[in-house]
Amino acid sequence: MNSDLPASKPDSSNESMTIERIQGTDGIRGPVCRLEDSSSSNPLAALLNEGVMTEEFFELYTYAYCQELLEADFASALDLVVIGWDPRDLSGRFNEAAVRGIRKAGLTAVVVDILPTPAVSLYQLHVGAACAFVLTASHNPADQNGIKIFLGHSNLKLFPEDDKRLTSRCLSIDYQELRNAPLLGELRNDQQAARKLFLDFMADQNNHWLSDHNLAGITIIVDVANGAFSPIIAELLKNVAADIVITNADPAQGINLRSGVADLEGVDYISAKEIDEGVFSAYETLRQMLSKGRDQQDRLRNSSDLVLGFVFDGDGDRCFLLCYDPFQDGILVLGGDVLAFFQASYLQQKHNWSQ
């Protein structure tokens, strides 16, 4: 679990802050706290001196990027900006602050609420929004949050030079002026429309590889990490012809807590002992896989049937594949690189590609 926040700086005045880039590899993420619980006088000082993001930093960050779009003529007044989030902000304070930043910049905040990152970016393309913000700290624990940005029309992420410009703009803004600025932009709630678009997109046979015959004899455990897939995963999978068990789909239990991909980073194999009485003994998904695998162990050893797990991160844009090993009574963990290889091999076979 990592934080993208920069190292502390000793001075809290914006003029003396010379850090080049406050983002990490995919937006910015790290510990959060309310401004009143911080010892700093403004959100940038809290970020650079204490290594925490306050709700007012979220307002500053979205406002700054919207200003970038307006000044570069990538957006005009009242253009659409889509914003969604994972369920970690139980109070809603950080989400609401980010929405205010969009509106104070004079753009229309199109709120899609709790949805996985792919659904937010899909809706951005659908409505032709100038950009999309996703408020998430991915696989990091619930006391952290962050902001991802998707560029309009292309859905691309920011390049490092874009991050540097955005950092510079954040440092140049007088937050006291922003705090008192009026809400110039409009507010639109498109949660249901965005949800329907994503569900319809995923149900389209052109957008997935599922069929009734290729799931026969397969048991699937789906772990959504108490995250962004939680409100929609049951409906998304309701027509899948397989034995499916959904786990960790209750955000109240804590996003990424003993669930999802967070604690499986760098793990290739999990033994039964680690699940029965070891470090993974409290992990429902692994216990379910072990139980279902053992129930079918003899058959699994002598057939092509499988017990699989699909394990997501908090914002639903990353997945690991788990596979019960009936011979060693353990679980194989396959990360993104291996999944990409399998997908490429499938496409090569399906389309008879020679290279």
Regions found by a protein language model. Name each.
Residues E71-Q144, E235-L321:
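N-terminal small/polar loop signature for handling phosphorylated ligands or for N-terminal nucleophile
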Residues I28-G30, L35, R88, P116, ...:
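Short, glycine-/Ser/Thr-/acidic-enriched flexible segments
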Residues V112-I114, S168-F198, D325-Q355:
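Proline/glycine-rich low-complexity loops and linkers
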